[in-house]
């Protein structure tokens, strides 16, 4: 059997440190008994967090999967939606073991690259801010931003949840009288961050698509709404040096 915090981290419920805090707080039970640090669990055990049952992945199989998905507009990155909108999980195949965990999210009006894995610890590490994993987007904004606005975005703008900056801004299409298109890179994934940054310099985002997450690029031949399995090894070392302390 595997230690409880490792099993629950593998299910994508949080880092091992977070789950250890939950155990100390008495929030987790195993087969009706309040869990203690050092407890172990396996598939078939009745594990609950705050009274809610948790599906345990088969850690013994050692089989991890990674999938790339080209998200269309109007799909939500949640397992269910109270408004009845289609979710990205409806388009994914059945995972061989465990369940698919999204590595970050895209809002309903953003398209492009989404990564999914059955390795909860990997997902947590790649999403944690300390990992500083690059996200690349193609963004179209209304109007032609002046050089001053681009400088502000590179140096940093203040949002309601703190400062934010682009590591890189490269023009893709700049035509007088038309919306401008840029390729931008940043190293965090706060809610609607790219849109809010452009709004802070007075330009509305009219189209937004993610084209890269870490070393994984959106394949040019992957149609929107389609998925593809890729080797998980391409992400195993990403974010390890800076994010290890967060796990």
Placement of each model-derived feature along the sequence:
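Basic, flexible Lys/Arg- and Gly-enriched helix-loop patches that mediate nucleic-acid binding at interfaces
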Residues: 1-247
């Amino acid at each position: 059997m595997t230690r409880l915090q490792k099993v629950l981290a593998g299910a994508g419920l949080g880092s091992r440190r977070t789950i250890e805090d939950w155990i100390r707080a008495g929030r987790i039970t195993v087969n009706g008994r309040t869990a203690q640090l050092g407890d172990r669990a396996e598939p078939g055990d009745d594990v609950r967090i705050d009274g809610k049952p948790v599906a345990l992945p088969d850690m013994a199989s050692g089989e991890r999967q990674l999938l790339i998905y080209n998200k269309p507009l109007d799909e939500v990155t949640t397992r269910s939606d109270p408004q009845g909108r289609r979710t990205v999980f409806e388009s994914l195949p059945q995972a061989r073991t465990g369940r698919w965990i999204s590595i970050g999210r895209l809002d309903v009006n953003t398209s492009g690259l989404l990564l999914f894995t059955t390795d909860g610890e990997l997902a947590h590490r790649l999403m944690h801010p300390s990992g500083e994993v690059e996200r690349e987007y193609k963004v179209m904004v209304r109007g032609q931003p002046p050089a001053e606005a681009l400088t502000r975005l590179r140096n940093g703008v203040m949002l309601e949840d703190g400062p934010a900056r682009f590591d890189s801004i490269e023009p893709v299409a700049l035509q007088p009288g038309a919306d401008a298109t840029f390729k931008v890179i940043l190293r965090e994934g706060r809610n609607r961050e790219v849109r809010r940054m452009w709004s802070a310099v007075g330009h509305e985002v009219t189209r937004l698509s993610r084209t890269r997450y870490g070393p994984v690029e959106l394949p040019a031949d992957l149609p929107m709404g389609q998925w593809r399995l890729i080797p998980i090894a391409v992400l195993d070392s990403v974010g390890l040096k800076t994010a290890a302390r967060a796990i």
